[in-house]
Each structure stands twice: as C-alpha cells, then as structure tokens.
C-alpha cells in the first residue's frame, strides 16, 4: 500500500495549478480556454481527491461549500468566455483533473512515464515502472500522487515529534518533491509533452 502525504501532495498540486493558470493568462484567454471541453471531461474521483486535500489544509475555506464547477472556476480550471458566453475547461483544469481520454485527445503527444532503475537484480532493466496502461486516469494530479511516494520511499524518515504530532517530512523529501514539481511546471506541455522521470541508486 502506498501512503499519501496529503499536505505535501496538496502543495505540489497547488503550485502547479497557479503556475499554469498564470502562464495561460499571460498568453491570453484564447490559449487558456479549451472550446468544447466541459465538466463531462473531468474525472470526478480525481477532483474529489484534490478537494479532500484542499479541505484538510483549509478546513474553514469558503470554497469547500462550492459545487465542483464553481470550485474549478475559483482555481482557474474552468472559465466563462465573456465575449460570447461559452464556457469550459482551461488547459490547467484538463491537465490536472481531466479524464485520460480527453487529455490524450487534446494533447495527443503527452506522455507520462516513471521508471525506477534502482535496486536492480541481475539483468533487470527496471524495478518499477508507471506508464499509461488503462488502470488510471492519466492526468497530472494522479501522476503526482503516484510518483512522489515512489521517488521518496527509499529516503529514511527519522522519528521526530512536533509536540504530540509525529513529523515525517525531511529536507530530502522536500527537495525531491520540489525538483519533481519544477520539472512539470517548466515543461511546455502544449509543445513537448514528454514527462519522463527516472530513479537511480547513485543519482
């Protein structure tokens, strides 16, 4: 079983959303708005997973009472085109929370791939691999949730207490998450859609 650090995954996702929405605004509303992509293209379990994390980190936030579309609008994942009244998902909304098929239709060159080349035995090429195989909706939020624990599971977690709360996070874990987050943020997914993460024993 993979244990998810809700706080860490939430902050990774929050940072990516802010960066993608900011970049879209800088390039203009046309790039931000995806015509014909609606809430039907959102993977609701993915969005609900993020909302659980959001509520955990912001228990009193007013957005917690919004429906899914209104919540996405507040994040910048869904917009209304004021020129003609049309509405739909943004690039950030689809990439972060979309169903796999609409994501692949809109970004047909996008590939998300994780390969673990650590702890190899004999002539093994890899000890673990995550790629799209039809068992998960391949959006960025799911990729984050599945890859971050794999990247950090071999890093020791010393027993530390913050008052009565156990503190498991370390500078090493934070550095790995930050590097992973920056890789995605700085990748131009509208041009070059390859997200490839490789893990080694000695790198």
Task: Please report, for each region that a protein language model flagged, where it lies by residue.
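Active-site helix-to-loop segments that bind/position phosphate- or nucleotide-bearing substrates
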Residues: 2-193, 198-203
